[in-house]
Amino acid sequence: MIKPKIALTIAGTDPTGGAGVMADLKSFHSCGVYGMGVVTSIVAQNTLGVQHIHNLNHQWVDEQLDSVFNDTLPHAIKTGMIATADTMETIRHYLMQHESIPYVIDPVMLAKSGDSLMDNNTKQNLQHTLLPLADVVTPNLPEAEEITGLTIDSEEKIMQAGRIFINEIGSKGVIIKGGHSNDADIAKDYLFTKEGVQTFENERFKTKHTHGTGCTFSAVITAELAKGRPLFEAVHKAKKFISMSIQYTPEIGRGRGPVNHFAYLKKEGLDDELSK
């Protein structure tokens, strides 16, 4: 029997399954990798917004990470919601011990509803602790603005932001997602590495049901990196995956509903291919 590749997510929860650890694990499964999850925050949220956040003590996060790393090693790691500086330092300790494992950061700062998920001190700490360790960071436009301090209102500003991530912050790669731009028809993303810039375009679907798209997108990249895919291929797969998951959204809940984490699998019938 061939052992599956393992992807680890370190993030907050969503009891409705649209975002956070729950969305990551479903995305990992759809990509044919074995998912593991460490919880940083218990978040009471649904499609209508975030009601309550209970951040776990960093020692509890450490205990979970210790349980994982004392038993097995993941082939790729992603972090999502990290609400305190102490928890960032805890995660950094494990990443520094395993620098060869691909690491993806989804810098979760705002929920789709607009609710803030990270205080200003923690946002500043992110730049010095985790971003320099990342193989790829996946900010949307508002998150890229928060991190770089720029007002990103043009393609030129996107290019400037990408250079800040690579040349000043020290991330190996960053994909700045253009889904929050005002373009009515096309969603354009920009992948920056030391080698240059590559762009990805896809149709923008007219739906409000996009809860958890950032989590899902970064989770698919993580799964593909766990399988040994090059970064460009991982991002290309994630773009196809997220487009289909939005196109076939299940329309759950009374607000901004989740995407369909199994649409790619079911539509294409790629169960075997995805597990390769």
Swiss-Prot record:
<keyword id="KW-0784">Thiamine biosynthesis</keyword>
<dbReference type="GO" id="GO:0009228">
    <property type="term" value="P:thiamine biosynthetic process"/>
</dbReference>
<dbReference type="InterPro" id="IPR013749">
    <property type="entry name" value="PM/HMP-P_kinase-1"/>
</dbReference>
<keyword id="KW-0808">Transferase</keyword>
<keyword id="KW-0418">Kinase</keyword>
<protein>
    <recommendedName>
        <fullName>Hydroxymethylpyrimidine/phosphomethylpyrimidine kinase</fullName>
        <ecNumber>2.7.1.49</ecNumber>
        <ecNumber>2.7.4.7</ecNumber>
    </recommendedName>
</protein>
<comment type="pathway">
    <text>Cofactor biosynthesis; thiamine diphosphate biosynthesis; 4-amino-2-methyl-5-diphosphomethylpyrimidine from 5-amino-1-(5-phospho-D-ribosyl)imidazole: step 2/3.</text>
</comment>
<keyword id="KW-0067">ATP-binding</keyword>
<dbReference type="GO" id="GO:0005524">
    <property type="term" value="F:ATP binding"/>
</dbReference>
<dbReference type="InterPro" id="IPR004399">
    <property type="entry name" value="HMP/HMP-P_kinase_dom"/>
</dbReference>
<comment type="pathway">
    <text>Cofactor biosynthesis; thiamine diphosphate biosynthesis; 4-amino-2-methyl-5-diphosphomethylpyrimidine from 5-amino-1-(5-phospho-D-ribosyl)imidazole: step 3/3.</text>
</comment>
<dbReference type="GO" id="GO:0005829">
    <property type="term" value="C:cytosol"/>
</dbReference>
<keyword id="KW-0547">Nucleotide-binding</keyword>
<comment type="similarity">
    <text>Belongs to the ThiD family.</text>
</comment>
<dbReference type="GO" id="GO:0008972">
    <property type="term" value="F:phosphomethylpyrimidine kinase activity"/>
</dbReference>
<comment type="function">
    <text>Catalyzes the phosphorylation of hydroxymethylpyrimidine phosphate (HMP-P) to HMP-PP, and of HMP to HMP-P.</text>
</comment>
<dbReference type="Pfam" id="PF08543">
    <property type="entry name" value="Phos_pyr_kin"/>
</dbReference>
<feature type="binding site">
    <location>
        <position position="45"/>
    </location>
    <ligand>
        <name>4-amino-5-hydroxymethyl-2-methylpyrimidine</name>
    </ligand>
</feature>
<dbReference type="GO" id="GO:0008902">
    <property type="term" value="F:hydroxymethylpyrimidine kinase activity"/>
</dbReference>
<dbReference type="InterPro" id="IPR029056">
    <property type="entry name" value="Ribokinase-like"/>
</dbReference>
<dbReference type="GO" id="GO:0009229">
    <property type="term" value="P:thiamine diphosphate biosynthetic process"/>
</dbReference>
